[in-house]
Amino acid sequence: MQMDCPRPTAYNGGNEEKERKLYKDIWKSERNVVCGMASHTGKIDMIRGSIIKSAALFALPICVGNILQQLYGTVDTLVVGNFCDSAALAAVGTATQPMEILLCVFLGIGNGASILVSQEMGRRNADGLRMLVRTAVWFLYLCAIPVTILAMFVGPALLRLMQVPADAFDYAVLYLRITALGTLGNLGYNMNAGILRGLGDSRSTLLLLLISCLTNIVLDVAFVAVLGMGVAGAALATTIALYLSWLTSILYARRNYEGLQFPLLPHGYDKAQLAAILKVGVPLGLNNSLYSVGHVAVQAVYNMQGSVFVAGCSIAGRVTGIAGIAITSFSSAAVVFAGQNLGAGNYRRLQRGVVQITCAAGVVTLLIGLVATVFCRPLLGLFSSDPAVLDAAVRYTWWVLPFIWTYAVFNCMMSFVNGTGAVKYTTVVNLLILWAVRIPAAYILHALGYGTSSMACVSLSYAVGLVAMLGYFLTPEWGKLRRKAKELGDAVTAETEPTL
């Protein structure tokens, strides 16, 4: 049953500033009724106000969170690399990949739940939100057990297929099995963080991530450097941090979003809600898994060019990752913006958001790409002093970074469409540009003797993806979306959004 919360109405006559303040107060009271949320939460209103401002406020904590994650990865590598041997370092690096492949599908399902939460939030459907959260938690426990078992017993076989060096194999199995015990915490934290983002609260997910990263770093130093536990210590630190972040996210949600009645343990589910989560989440999860496998295929072409070329591509990835942080942040904002405004029936605002947020992402990444390209050699020199490695890294940077803006626009458009729940088209496009464009182009360039320029396939796939997503807005599917939004009720006529 939907909450009986009237939508804000336009006000005529009187002082415009007073009317706007009164409108804002009524809207704030409505969203508090829906979630039962405390006034100090970091929830961003995506349905009203300046589109760019709300998207930027939402994206900024995610951007900082991505930087934190990269910082943690660097510290983790430094600790293991300095207090363990090279075999242990190799084991930690390789053992994470099987877990990522196993978790991809289920993390995609979590993203599906986040999209549905944003849509229910746009509708102000309190009962729907509560049942959706219960169903997501129930499904979380259902998934955690088989994934843990698969990781424990199938993981070693995956490590053999990856040709893990013999001296690192036992370490890798140990790391994999200990971190597999953290599957429930991993899936739980990502599910809860997705729900909070769906509500528009990205600031809280940053704080939760900060707690997790700091815990992980402190325990890494304690277990590996102080207690000398080696690989087992690094794995245990990761597992404890995952469970702490999961439990903290539950406590936070129960305190600040009382209306959601956030459960710790499974407490019933709704078949229709579960079917909706799977309908959106399974294609996203399969897309993630196949995309990961596809990256391995492209990496194989890079490996054929020799260790110097691979090293160059590796450090160039650090620089291109700067633009990647901005792209991920804008794309996350696009998903939630689309979901909430579709749920509220704000089709015209949704149209403006597609243009404004994708253009903002394109401009920001274009500037980052140009600056990083111009100063790429001194930046890359921070990671290596080998002239041959630097030459390969500079070549990679020049082939990719100047065109990274096309990926930003393409990815934001794709995120908008995902936010509306139309994930089939984006899944097909994503797999098409990887398996029909990027991978064949890389192997063709290698076969023609241009293997050291095979990274050009990346920029080519970005351009094809951009054209494919532009084509979506000419398809009947976009027209269906417009009719769906109209059925939900167009609230844009009552909007008093400031002019940008």
Where does each model-flagged region fall?
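Transmembrane helical elements of multi-pass membrane transporters/channels
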Residues: 57-76, 178, 189, 212, ...
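Residue-level hotspots within pore-lining transmembrane alpha-helices
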Residues: 68, 72, 102, 106, ...
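Short runs within selected transmembrane alpha-helices of multi-pass transporters and secretion channels
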Residues: 110, 178-197, 205-213, 234-249, ...
